[in-house]
């Protein structure tokens, strides 16, 4: 009798463990995307945890959002919200999404520099970034800023090589210009004549 009772208790405990594991998997590891599609959540520098929840609720399954909130309550994320563009993918659960957002592991955007590089066109790059177009325009018309990169306000547009770049959505104006300077130097290494022909400068 006693052995049977122990056996039944062991079976019940095992069943409970399996159920708990199943529930845990469902909440923390099953797809967070509410419709099986990839979505992006943009966290601005004026967002707080409540606005993050609101943005997540538009693209997340309810059980995954509940799990995300549990993880938030168990950590200090609410007071350390990090800006960025975060992917909510079909293969990503609440736990992985939470880790990405807590650690600032965002998904870059494809930023295309047009072949027509007027200052107004370059300021429009802000449409793909968190920065404001006025901030980009201010930097490109600043003699001090242009001089820092070896240009003046009339030639700074030449630093922007037409191409598509992977860049983080929350990149600052300074980091954007640093990246463009790096890409420009890389482009012009080697045969300058060939590169100039590619750019239709000769």
Question: Where are the predicted features?
Answer:
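Conserved catalytic or metal-liganding residues and their short signature motifs at active sites
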Residues: 1-202
